[in-house]
A protein has these predicted regions:
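N-terminal targeting signals for export/organelle localization
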Residues: 1-38, 150-151, 171
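A short beta-strand-turn-helix
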Residues: 36-57
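Active-site acidic short loop of glycosyltransferases
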Residues: 53-55, 85, 112-113
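Short pre-active-site segment immediately N-terminal to redox-active cysteine/selenocysteine motifs
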Residues: 55-57, 61-65, 135
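Short, thiol/selenol-centered motifs that function as redox-active sites or metal-ligating centers
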Residues: 66-70
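Structural microenvironment flanking redox-active thiols in thiol-disulfide oxidoreductases
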Residues: 71-110, 121-127
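Thiol/disulfide oxidoreductase modules built on the thioredoxin-like
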Residues: 110-112, 120-166
Length: 171
């Protein structure tokens, strides 16, 4: 009787193992950095999260009280306008502790040409693919595969970032 039960279990395990689907090469899904951006967006420019894979993405972490962050906004808008049509996307991630309460009026007032996301508690505590954000602004450049290709602490200069974006867009 035990042998029969063991044989049935083995057959069941083998049958179920054969039902498992195997992903095709290159379809492992978005990178952990892109998955970390699955956050609520506020303001007039929503994030179409499904359009991020395959694009070069500039992720800038900021806070509404951070003066260098605010000073960097025109540079980010210019980069989006200049490179957006070629497959580039700027994404602003707000680390304000009051979240939507502060970021929604901010995003509506500035009417930026790129999405503004509201960070969640795990991200604020450094538990995301981006790790702990040590200072603001903090900017990451992701390649078309969603991997970090560049990073800047503090204000990023337009020409430096633009050159890095152009290089990734050509790949």
């Amino acid at each position: 009787m035990r042998r029969a039960a063991l044989a049935v279990r083995c057959a069941l395990v083998l049958a179920l193992a054969g039902c498992r689907t195997v992903p095709e090469a290159g379809s492992a899904g978005p990178s952990p950095y892109l998955r970390a951006l699955a956050l609520p967006s506020v303001g007039p420019t929503p994030l179409d999260w499904n359009r991020l894979p395959g694009r070069v993405v500039l992720v800038s972490f900021f806070a509404t009280w951070c003066f260098p962050c605010l000073a960097e906004l025109p540079t980010l808008e210019a980069l989006q306008k200049e490179h957006g049509p070629q497959g580039f996307q700027v994404v602003l991630v707000g680390l304000d502790l009051d979240g939507t309460k502060v970021l929604e009026p901010f995003a509506n007032q500035y009417a930026l040409n790129f999405p503004v996301l509201v960070s969640d508690e795990p991200m604020q505590k450094g538990r995301s693919a981006f790790g702990l954000i040590p200072s603001l602004p903090c900017t990451f450049l992701l390649d078309k595969e969603g991997q970090v290709a560049g990073a800047w602490q503090g204000m990023a200069g337009h020409s430096d970032v633009s050159r890095a974006v152009e290089k990734l867009l050509r790949r």
